[in-house]
Each structure stands twice: as structure tokens, then as C-alpha cells.
Curated annotation (Swiss-Prot):
It comes from Bradyrhizobium sp. (strain BTAi1 / ATCC BAA-1182). SUPFAM superfamilies: dUTPase-like (SSF51283). This enzyme is involved in nucleotide metabolism: it produces dUMP, the immediate precursor of thymidine nucleotides and it decreases the intracellular concentration of dUTP so that uracil cannot be incorporated into DNA. Belongs to the dUTPase family. The gene is dut. It catalyses: dUTP + H2O = dUMP + diphosphate + H(+). It holds the Pfam family dUTPase. GO terms for biological process: dUMP biosynthetic process; dUTP catabolic process. This is Deoxyuridine 5'-triphosphate nucleotidohydrolase. The keyword Repeat does not apply.
């Protein structure tokens, strides 16, 4: 069973009238985020360009959680549009508007209209690390093999 946590959401003036982020299927990990651009002023992303797209929402995440802003696979596959800093992290102490940094890797301009699903948001538990300086690390079969070292 998946845990459900309560998250307070503030709808900003330019987000009024848009539905809240929602899961599209019973087992979806992410909720779709919608573009809160003006209805009479869609945002056009030219090839190679990027822009911050507002969602009209602010969150109060509980301590120990983050929101990850991830691409929607359909936008990437069909149009080459993706989240530039994927995954974007929204920390539990951030109270500003959730914006999505989109980039158009496609060859055609892409128009973002009000209410369009532009990204997905995954709520995830956060583990905090305590780093400890050492002069040696435990040995592994992989060792220091990096990029491409485990094969194709």
C-alpha cells in the first residue's frame, strides 16, 4: 500500500481556475503539473530555447519530503520538449511558486497553452547523509570504473 501524505497547496492568482495537480492513473508515481500562462498569451518555445513556465501553485511539503519535477515522456518523445534541470528539486522549506524549466530540443516551435500538462511532480522521502572523511574506501568489484565501465 502506498502512503498518502497531506500537502498544503496555495493557489496563486494566475493559477485560479486550473485543476490541482492530479495522478492520471491508480498507480502513477507523478502528478501532472499544468501551465498557468495567460489564456490569451500562450508561451512559444522556439527550437533550442528554454523558459520558466509558471504553475500558479506553491506548496508546503512536510519535513523529510521533496517534490521532484520531471519531464512528461510524451512531450519529450513527440516534440523534444523536456525539463532542463531534470529532476528539479523542490525542498520542504521552499514556499515560492513551483515553476518548470522547459527546453525545446525539437526542430519546430512548441506552443504552451494555459492548462496544458507540462511536467510531472513526484513526492519523495528524503534521506540526509552525514559525510565522514576517510583515507581509504572499501573495495568493490567495480572499483573506480566510471562511464561505460559496466558494458553496454
Amino acid at each position: 500500500m502506498t502512503e498518502t501524505i497531506a500537502i498544503d497547496v496555495q493557489i496563486l492568482p494566475h493559477g485560479e481556475g486550473l485543476p490541482l495537480p492530479a495522478y492520471q492513473t491508480a498507480h502513477a508515481a507523478g502528478m501532472d503539473l499544468l501551465a498557468a500562462v495567460a489564456a490569451d498569451a500562450p508561451l512559444v518555445l522556439g527550437p533550442g530555447s528554454h523558459a520558466m513556465v509558471p504553475t500558479g501553485l506553491s506548496l508546503a511539503l512536510p519535513d523529510g519530503y521533496e517534490a521532484q519535477v520531471r519531464p512528461r515522456s510524451g512531450l519529450a518523445a513527440r516534440h523534444g520538449v523536456t525539463v532542463l534541470n531534470a529532476p528539479g528539486t523542490v525542498d520542504a522549506d521552499y514556499r515560492g511558486e513551483i515553476c518548470v524549466l522547459l527546453i525545446n530540443h525539437g526542430k519546430e516551435p512548441f506552443t504552451i497553452r494555459r492548462g496544458e500538462r507540462i511536467a510531472q511532480m513526484v513526492i519523495a522521502a528524503v534521506a540526509r547523509a552525514a559525510l565522514s572523511i576517510t583515507t581509504t574506501l572499501s573495495a568493490t568489484a567495480r572499483g573506480s570504473g566510471g562511464f561505460g565501465s559496466t558494458g553496454r
